């Protein structure tokens, strides 16, 4: 027996060569079914017992502070608190969460960790079922962060680290009939923490299930299931390797395959152990092998995830079933062929996302229900793949991916991003075993899942000898799947696929201080390198941090154009915000530094496509549209015909309806629907109208298409929209201005302070006052009521986006970041001066000209020339010319802002929507007549920034204001400066007034990454002169 004092003295958690002690060898998940029927039906096993629930808990400052008697079976823990298992103790009122992206939250001195090492001790009393006593009983911890020692009934059992894979211990010789006691000492930091630097919250504790498993003394120890298909992918076979817990000739393994309705597909086939010769020394007597032919099996894919069920039973010499296991089986073949990744002979297009396991209240302790929400959202938004960034996921995740149809890149729990260089530990021989176990144990646990199509060696650990060893072992252990790894350049000998991060479509990414070094080539260029025949799949791309995902569609144009560009995985799925309550009792989502964690990387954990509660970011719609499985094009001719191309590889569209409409100036003038039948990888031409609708001068015409489900699916209900398209139809342009209504000019008067323009306004008296000192409309009366709180002013500023700020680490600011350039120029501090103002009465209007200069420290940066044309109907046409200093960096926006009284009326507009969109993110936002509440016009990004824009607007109604022209629209109750200064949504101050921002031009948001200027050139405002016009009026 190992004494407690010896354990403390040994400090296994600071020895990289001690990764485990007395841990059971890794294997596929086991359930210990008592019969074949129970295994077939997947009944709850009587030989499994979850130990989740309330445990006794105490947190100590360091392992040395733990009293040695707390491991005793009779220790009185009544003064301790209860804690929920599974959970992270930082979210149960102990210690504090820490977020870092790259740097370690402690001194980088591997394998040593801080002396102040929070240590949680868990205790649980449980009762062993009487029927279990003469069996082999193990306890399985599915996830404990970061390392732990285990005692049973006061006796030390073993030690484990690796937070994301199971640790199983044999308790058979420690258990007693009736009551038993477990004690677990969990350390926050261990040498394993150096391998788990994965751009997420550092959280601790028993955060996955704890389970007791009882097996016969001689039982099934492991099972490997694989499938094969013939060269034509018509007929197949299932291969099953069954391993015994010890060598014996007294048993037979029996295997039978059942279909999705649990009807038998094959006969029951038995095989003895030790039948096949392994080498010249003979067979393995603990191994039985089956290869069973399966004619014309249903094949598994993300589109049609058909699952069989294989039941494996251990039968003794008397014909009695002593142990049974069962697994879901998908018939599919993954291969690399002709420079492409293929499944069942078809080249895949990966519509992928990186996904952290995260819950805003439970941290890393996620439930089946939480996982199911993610699965359905992924399917609904046209994702077909997920990368388990950057660690093996909860075992249930893979079952759901098997069932619902998602391709999985299963990634080892390995990242050393904070090392200098990153490969420091990857070449240190003393760390080899730690690396290898993280790979080998993942493969052994997850090998039977059809959804897993690629193994990954980990993330951002440089490239070292250990990676080559991991790669070679994996290829030999499982030749049925490719292996990928980005480290060392994304195209090394340790990867079967080129898997770069954040490589651009057409532009090489160079190092600032080494312009001749090309660490990331443009993805199109990469394919053309000499002797390069591998496919390219971006393991991370399109950094979705806040208001992002600009120019995302360009990646998808390239993916569809180049067959060896086979998609990628967006970074990432969910904002890793944690729920916190402020002093006013309001909830908000916290990020790095919000818990007093001094070493942190602020909001860099907030880069998901969905909020922590899984409500959607606007960027999701863009991803869904770009990734959709149907493409549309208009067919030339007199009839309204559309060509539909199906990107489904395996299934015909049998459960979908095509709904279409034609709009004139946003109003539907024709519509229809038809059942959609398009075979996989084929096209179909449909005639929607026998002739084009008659056109009116000056109206815009659009064809709008939706593909909707006409029956329920496991992941969505009938009526759900899976694909959309909008096609601009020919229109007759308005060649001349629409003549104004015949009437006289409004009345003009002025004094030394103001210019006043008054008129009848279609029967309603109006009066405008323009302040001569400011050059701005100071009052706009209609029927005696003032309609504005502040008149239109130049607006060149936006509250900085994460992509504008440009940093991935809190202390590493990019001097080329947009916000740095704007701050240097003083854009946020421009001081406007009215240089000249004059007014004149024309035949039917009053013309007011104003000249502005915008200065920083008496230096003129921007001049703007405004011309108000005010007619007797109360309409104000605003023409603006803007001139920029040659030295000025591209501006974030050029337009105007005015302030209106608060209103509960919804905003109506004819333009892109209904969701937020920006000039480089408009693919999913169709032009139509939209209506949203004021609240819906605001996007509550966790780190507040510019938001809520709607592009390409022709006309809009905000409160009593009507606007027409060509502009982008944003409406908010928050000022731009408040948004810019706020760190969280609870810092936003509702001013109970409406800020109406009318942009003629707006810079793109970018999003190829978030730490360098990533807005594409065509979406930069880099001209020296701009002109725009719009018309304002009040009802």
UniProtKB/Swiss-Prot annotation:
Enzyme group, top EC level? hydrolase
Q: What does the record note about the cofactor?
A: Binds 2 magnesium ions per monomer.
Catalyzed reaction equations: Hydrolysis of terminal non-reducing beta-D-galactose residues in beta-D-galactosides
- Give cofactor(s), names only: Mg(2+); Na(+)
Give the record's GO biological process terms. lactose catabolic process
Enzyme Commission numbers on file? 3.2.1.23
Q: Which domain of life is it from?
A: Bacteria
Q: Which InterPro entries match?
A: B-gal_small/dom_5, Bact_Beta-galactosidase, Beta-gal/glucu_dom_sf, Gal_mutarotase_sf_dom, Galactose-bd-like_sf, GH-type_carb-bd, Glyco_hydro_2, Glyco_hydro_2_AS
Sorted alphabetically, the keyword list is: Glycosidase, Hydrolase, Magnesium, Metal-binding, Sodium
Q: Which residues form the active site?
A: 460, 540
Annotated GO molecular function terms are:
beta-galactosidase activity; carbohydrate binding; magnesium ion binding
Residues noted as binding Mg(2+) 1 in the record, renumbered to the chain: 415, 417, 460
Q: Which residues make up the binding site for substrate?
A: 101, 199, 460, 540-543, 607, 1011
> Where is the site Transition state stabilizer?
356, 390
Q: A cellular component term (GO) from this record?
A: beta-galactosidase complex
Residue ranges that the Swiss-Prot or TrEMBL entry lists as coiled coil? none
Q: Which family does it belong to?
A: Belongs to the glycosyl hydrolase 2 family.
Under PANTHER family, the record lists:
BETA-GALACTOSIDASE
Quaternary structure, per UniProt, is: Homotetramer.
Question: What is the official name of this protein in its record?
Answer: Beta-galactosidase
Name the source organism: Psychromonas ingrahamii (strain DSM 17664 / CCUG 51855 / 37)
């Amino acid at each position: 027996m190992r004494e407690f004092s010896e354990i403390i003295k040994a400090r296994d958690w600071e020895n990289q060569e001690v990764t485990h002690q007395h841990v059971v060898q890794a294997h596929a998940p086991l359930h210990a079914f008592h019969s074949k029927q129970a295994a077939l039906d997947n009944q709850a096993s009587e030989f499994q017992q979850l130990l989740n629930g309330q445990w006794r808990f105490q947190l100590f400052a360091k392992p040395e502070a733990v009293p040695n008697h707390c491991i005793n079976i009779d220790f009185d823990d009544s003064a301790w608190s209860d804690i929920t298992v599974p959970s992270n103790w930082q979210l149960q009122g102990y210690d504090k969460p820490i977020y870092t992206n790259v740097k370690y939250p402690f001194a980088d001195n591997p394998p040593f960790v801080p002396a102040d090492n929070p240590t949680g001790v868990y205790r649980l009393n449980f009762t062993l079922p009487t029927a279990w006593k003469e069996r082999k009983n193990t306890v399985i911890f599915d996830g404990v962060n970061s390392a732990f020692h285990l005692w049973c009934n006061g006796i030390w059992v073993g030690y484990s680290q690796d937070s994301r894979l199971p640790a199983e211990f044999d308790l058979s010789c420690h258990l007693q009939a009736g009551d038993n006691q477990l004690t677990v000492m969990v350390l926050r930091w261990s040498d394993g923490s150096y391998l788990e630097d994965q751009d997420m919250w550092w959280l601790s504790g028993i955060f996955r299930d704890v389970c007791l498993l009882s097996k016969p003394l001689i039982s099934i120890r492991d099972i490997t299931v694989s499938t094969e298909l013939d060269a034509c992918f018509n007929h197949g076979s299932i291969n099953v390797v069954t391993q015994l817990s010890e060598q014996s000739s007294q048993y037979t393994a029996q295997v039978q395959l059942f279909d999705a309705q649990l009807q038998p597909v094959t006969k029951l086939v038995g095989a003895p152990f030790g039948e096949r010769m392994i080498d010249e020394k003979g067979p393995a007597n603990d191994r039985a092998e089956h290869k069973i032919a399966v004619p014309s099996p249903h094949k598994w894919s993300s589109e049609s995830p058909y699952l069989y069920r294989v039941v494996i039973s251990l039968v003794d010499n008397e014909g009695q079933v002593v142990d049974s296991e069962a697994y879901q089986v998908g018939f599919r073949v993954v291969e690399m062929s002709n420079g492409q990744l293929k499944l069942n002979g078809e080249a895949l297009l990966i519509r992928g996302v990186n996904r952290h396991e995260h819950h805003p209240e439970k941290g890393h302790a996620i439930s089946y229900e939480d996982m199911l929400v993610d699965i359905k959202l992924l399917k609904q938004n046209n994702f077909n793949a997920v990368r388990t960034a950057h660690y093996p996921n909860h075992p249930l995740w893979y079952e759901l991916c098997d069932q619902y149809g998602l391709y999985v890149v299963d990634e080892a729990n390995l990242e050393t991003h904070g090392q200098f260089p990153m490969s420091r530990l990857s070449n240190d021989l003393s760390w080899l075993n730690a690396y290898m176990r993280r790979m080998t144990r993942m493969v052994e646990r997850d090998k039977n899942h059809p959804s897993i199509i690629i193994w990954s060696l980990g993330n951002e650990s440089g490239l070292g000898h250990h990676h080559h060893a991991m790669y070679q072992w994996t290829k030999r252990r499982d030749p049925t799947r490719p292996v990928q790894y980005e480290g060392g350049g994304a195209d090394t000998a340790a990867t079967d696929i080129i898997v770069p991060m954040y490589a651009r479509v057409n532009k090489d990414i160079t190092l600032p201080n080494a312009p001749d070094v090309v660490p990331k080539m443009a993805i199109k260029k990469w394919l053309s390198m000499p002797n390069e025949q591998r496919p390219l799949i971006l393991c991370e791309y399109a950094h979705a941090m806040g208001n992002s995902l600009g120019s995302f569609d360009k990646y998808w144009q390239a993916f569809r154009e180049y067959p060896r560009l086979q998609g990628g995985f967006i970074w990432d799925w969910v904002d890793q915000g944690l729920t916190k309550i402020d002093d006013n009792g309001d909830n908000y989502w916290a990020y790095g530094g919000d818990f007093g964690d001094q070493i942190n990387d602020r909001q860099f954990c907030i880069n998901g496509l969905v909020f922590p509660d899984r409500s959607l970011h606007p960027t999701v719609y863009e991803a869904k549209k770009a990734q959709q499985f149907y493409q549309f094009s208009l067919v030339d001719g007199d009839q309204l015909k559309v060509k539909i191309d199906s990107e489904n590889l395996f299934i015909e569209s049998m459960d979908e309806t095509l709904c279409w409409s034609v709009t004139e100036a946003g109003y539907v003038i024709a519509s229809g629907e038809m059942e959609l039948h398009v075979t996989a990888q084929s096209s179909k031409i449909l005639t929607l109208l026998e002739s084009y609708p008659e056109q009116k001068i000056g109206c815009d015409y659009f064809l709008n298409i939706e593909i909707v489900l006409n029956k329920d699916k496991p992941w969505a209900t009938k009526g759900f929209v899976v694909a959309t398209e909008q096609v601009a139809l020919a229109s007759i342009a308005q060649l001349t201005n629409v003549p104004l209504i015949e009437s006289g000019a409004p009345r003009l008067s002025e004094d030394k302070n103001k210019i006043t323009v008054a008129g009848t306004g279609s029967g309603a008296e109006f009066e405008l006052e323009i302040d001569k000192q400011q050059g701005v409309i100071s009052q706009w009366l209609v029927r005696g009521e003032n309609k504005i709180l502040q008149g239109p002013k130049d607006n060149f500023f936006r509250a900085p986006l994460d992509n504008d700020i440009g940093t991935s680490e809190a202390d590493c600011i990019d001097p080329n970041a947009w916000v740095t350039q704007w701050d240097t120029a003083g854009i946020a501090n421009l001081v406007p001066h009215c240089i000249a103002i004059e007014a004149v009465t024309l035949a039917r209007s009053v013309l007011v000209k104003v000249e502005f200069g915008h200065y920083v420290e008496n230096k003129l940066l921007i001049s703007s020339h405004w011309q108000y044309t005010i007619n007797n109907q109360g309409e104000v046409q605003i023409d603006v010319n803007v001139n920029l200093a040659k030295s000025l960096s591209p501006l974030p926006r050029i337009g105007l802002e005015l302030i209106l009284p608060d209103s509960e009326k919804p905003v109506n507009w004819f333009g892109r929507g209904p969701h937020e969109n920006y000039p480089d993110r408009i693919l999913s936002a169709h032009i139509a007549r939209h209506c949203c509440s004021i609240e819906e016009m605001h996007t509550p990004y966790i780190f507040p920034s510019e938001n809520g824009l709607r592009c390409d607007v022709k006309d809009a109604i905000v409160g009593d204001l009507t606007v027409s022209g060509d502009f982008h629209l944003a409406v908010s109750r928050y000022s731009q400066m408040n948004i810019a200064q706020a760190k969280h949504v609870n810092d936003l101050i509702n001013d109970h007034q409406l800020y109406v921002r009318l942009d003629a031009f707006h810079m793109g948001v970018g999003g190829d990454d978030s730490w360098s200027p990533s807005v594409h050139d065509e979406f930069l405002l880099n001209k020296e002169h701009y002109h725009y016009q719009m018309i304002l009026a009040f009802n």
